[in-house]
Amino acid sequence: VLPGHAGVEFTLSDLESAYNAAAAGETVDLPNATVETPDVTAEQLQKVLFCDVLSTYTTKVGGASGRRANVKLTASRITGYILNSGETMKYGPLVTPFTAANGYSAAPGYLQGKTVDMVGGGACQASSTLYAAALYANLEIVQRTNHGFASDYIGLGLDATVAQGGPEFEFRNNTNYPIKVVAEYYTSGGKDYLKVTLRGTKVDDSYVKIKTEVLETIPFTEEIV
């Protein structure tokens, strides 16, 4: 946050008149000019920016080492992202392309109804964890698509798939203050976890509760061994 500065407001016609009436080297006054000072000081902003945890969501990271590496990499590419009021955050542009040259490993992922090895497999765990955090922070969801299968690392209805040239996850900061994304990959008790925290400024004590309901169960018709 940069310090604020006072400004002076005046009309060009007043300035032109004073300039034309002044002698060479003379200092003139603009009697109708007004001094405008900032409504909020830098010190006041420092006290309210990112001072509250709007939400936090944690998922357990499992699978092959390549998958865990991909989750850790995507987390590192979204952490620290700041959305000003009214701005949106798109997940895809921050983490793609899913290529070896961009640091990604081959790992299992969903593709056209099947689980296959692909470069960047597991990248959707970060988008899903971020989506859940955005939901619990009551932020506006602009784009979100679920996986074709339920994901074992997150609850029903809380996943968000992202694919290069395909589904995207995007949400908007619909609060009046900036929001910072903090993504942390850590190990505890020999297990890996991803925690996404959204920091901002709370203006009330409201909170979000999410409830899922099974509307229909479709029995399988093919048994895959």
Question: At which residue positions do the language-model features occur?
Answer:
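Well-ordered beta-sheet/strand-loop patches within structured domains
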Residues: 1-225
